[in-house]
Amino acid sequence: AKYTQNSAITKETVITYKKYLQENYAVRSVNSMLASINSLFVFLGWHDLKVKSLKLQQQVFCPEEKELTKAEYARLCRTAERKHNERLNLILQTICGTGIRVSELQYITVEAVKNGEAVVNCKAKTRSVFIVKELKQKLLRYAAEQGIKSGMIFVTRTGKPISRTNIWREMKALCEEANVNPQKVFPHNLRHLFARVFYGIEKDIAKLADILGHSSINTTRIYIISTGTGHRHRMENMRLII
């Protein structure tokens, strides 16, 4: 009503509204709102009033407050160990050491660990996930201590897979003692850390996409973006200012 003044809606009115959105909202929010009104225009048959969404430039840097570092990850693991939460400690190391999704923890079974390889089925795709020797030893020792002789290693007291929410809550409880920004601490960030470390060694994005189970390399690119700090250091080292 603010833009139509109780008069007919014109293309100019919609463009004015789009400009208002650009000045007051983030790009993704603007595009979401534009998609809604475009759908309404299609429903009403007002196709000539539709407007284009804003182009969203691919993110180049990861905000520092969101990137979990290797040192912070190590502190989280040590804190979990000090709190005698060995299950959480090993969940962190398993996700970060293999690059699997939280939902794929169910494939980390005693049988898979003994074999050093888990066969993961996710999103209509099957892939093999290798389990390195050191992680294998830790997981088998934990399973033996818990009396788990077969099947899933990470389970609740009732034998069900641990939910993402439970892992998230337990991870957040480590933040203060581990001195890690809570904004960085969520399960999927461990997968991102795996991706950055792997790419830093191999520089093979296609191979990394296969390991992570991505259908598109564009998704993998999002995982390996670093903070602006690293980019700034590289530019400083170029020494092109005379």
PLM region spans:
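Conserved catalytic core of the tyrosine transesterase superfamily
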Residues: 1-242
